[in-house]
Amino acid sequence: MRHVWVIGAATLLFATTAPAFEGTIKLRTTALTADQLAEGNGGKKLDDAAILAMTPEQLAKNDKAQVRESMVYVSGSKVRMDMPMESKGSGYAVVDLDKGLTWFVVPGEKRYIEWSETDAKAIGEKMAQMKKMMTERMASMPPDQRKQVEAMMKNMQMPDDEAAPQPTVAITPLNKTQTINGMSATGYKATEDENTVVAWVTNDQPELNKALLNVSERMEKLTPANMRKENVRRQLQQKGLPVMVQNLGGGRYRVEEIIAVEQKPVEATLFVVPQDYAKTTGRDALKNIPGPGGPPASAPAAAAPAKKP
């Protein structure tokens, strides 16, 4: 599910920085495990080359294939992405780049979460406080428990930590082109986190391609410098719009596609969160996390109601 949001968020965000583009983007993700692929092949295990040669249409013929579709709506600086939620029905995200705000909306529960740079900063500060508190308490811990906490803290990155060296991700041209969902695309191959990635990149959408790097820079501002990670998708964005990304690893094969891009007027109401929905923010989640001074207050001061997006 996370990967659907990743490709969707990347597409919807970079689209908004191009004022000339207004319309919709349709996404689809198709996934199967290696065992399910073998079952569909008469019990015979397929090698990586055979799996990567399978198209989404071929995968979808397997009755165990997980197929999910979602829509992205773009209008000026506002973007909305609809998508299914495994346990709560459908949900959507609204991004307003002019305001620097994102709203994650859950209609089934009539609530939404607001996220901003202020929330990201507050969470980073809280993480630093927690790390300091754990460091102070380690001195009184039994040796075994102290080792466990030390190991956990070693993997925790804080806003004031130095950035860890980033491994170089090599992207190799396949020297192949094909038409995918009506768009001419060039193939590339890479390895990331022990996964094989084959991506097909198009330049048929110039407005979207031009906006890609601008949005990447905006998104980086929401992440502390030491926590930013160079990845295959970021490098692919330098080459154009990834119209299809095949990912094989961990016993799973997943294909993410942009199956349609349509330029047309979009209703303004799609970007409005209902007034009667309950609001929470990223900072609200911090109220129940104890700080260095002890447990959180039992009755925090009420905040003034914020304006709806």
Please tell me what each predicted stretch does.
Residues 15-17:
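N-terminal signal peptide c-region/cleavage motif recognized by signal peptidases
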Residues 1-4:
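Positively charged n-region of N-terminal signal peptides that target proteins for export
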Residues 19-309:
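Extended soluble regions of mature proteins
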Residues 11-12:
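Repetitive helical segments and hydrophobic/amphipathic motifs
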